[in-house]
Design a protein with these regions (language model features):
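Helix-start (N-cap) detector for alpha-helical repeat units in TPR-like alpha-solenoids
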Residues: 1-2, 35-36, 69-70, 103-104, ...
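Canonical tetratricopeptide repeat
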Residues: 6, 40, 74, 108, ...
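Structural signature of tandem alpha-helical TPR/SEL1-like repeats
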Residues: 14-26, 48-60, 81-94, 116-128, ...
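Terminal, low-structured helical/coil segments at or just beyond the last alpha-helical repeat
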Residues: 217, 222-260
């Protein structure tokens, strides 16, 4: 059994999630009283984006050990994957009640609260996280989103820029800052920022997409099409979203040939 556990961890590290999951499911059947097996299984299901199976595994862990904060966190994460913000918040609140300094749970709850525009409650989580770690990047980005939502664009920009300075490889910071520039009609700044992001990571699909959007708004249709095509090449799942981006580009044949 111990060897199976080591092997499942090795599969996870190698990215062989299907093999890891198969092994963990066998382990769960052999020793159905071990919380750790179900927690690992839930994490593997998360990697596979199988949120219903993740929820089942987390629930089984809770049935074994009701007071396990990580199990409640994973259950909240599973509901988040199914776009159920209310139940996400409920499960994460339970996790935080069990473990008050649970940074990951507070950050995930803050994201769900952002979706519901519950900014006051969201800031309570963000402040609690930043009190533990003043340079927690996700907390700073979420604080920026609150400021942006409240019409404080300059203050939001400061938060986003600060994160890019702390960690130049934080891609979410570039996306938030670039999207803010686009909303503010600072299209040249947005394009320049995404140039920088793509230089740091030439496979940054979202940066190509957002740069394409900025170029389109700036009147550069050809450049926009090239960026959108590159984004789609890097992330084929985005095809439906890209179709929407080009709805104002005239005949489909002039927009992105081959994907419509």
């Amino acid at each position: 059994f111990e060897t199976m556990g080591y092997l499942s961890q090795l599969y996870i590290q190698m990215g062989e999630t299907a093999k890891a999951r198969e092994l963990l499911e066998k382990m769960a059947a052999m020793e159905p009283h071990l919380t750790s097996t179900f927690l690992t299984l839930a994490n593997v299901c998360f990697i596979q984006e199988d949120y219903q199976a993740m929820e089942e595994a987390a629930n089984k862990a809770i049935a074994i050990e009701e007071g396990n904060a990580v199990a409640h966190y994973l259950l909240g994460k599973a509901r988040k994957g199914q776009n159920d913000d209310l139940m996400t918040i409920a499960h994460l609140t339970k996790a935080i009640t069990l473990k008050d300094d649970f940074i990951e749970a507070r950050l995930l709850r803050a994201e769900a609260l952002l979706n519901l525009k519950q900014y006051k409650e969201m800031m309570e989580d963000i402040d609690a996280v930043l009190a533990q770690n003043p340079e927690e990047e996700t907390a700073m980005l979420l604080r920026g989103k609150v400021k942006e939502s409240n019409g404080q664009g300059e203050e939001a920009e400061e938060d986003y820029k600060l994160v890019t300075e702390i960690n130049p490889f934080n891609e979410q910071a570039y996306l938030y800052l670039g999207q803010l520039y686009i909303n503010q009609k600072k299209l040249t700044e947005a394009i320049g920022l995404f140039d920088e992001a793509i230089e740091l990571n030439p496979n940054f699909a979202e940066a190509y997409k957002e740069r394409g959007r900025a170029k389109l708004l700036n009147g550069d249709k050809d450049g926009s099409v090239e960026d959108m095509k590159k984004s789609l090449e890097l992330n084929p799942k985005e095809e439906a979203n890209l179709n929407g981006e080009f709805k104002n580009l005239g005949p489909k044949s002039e927009a992105l040939p081959g994907i419509f």
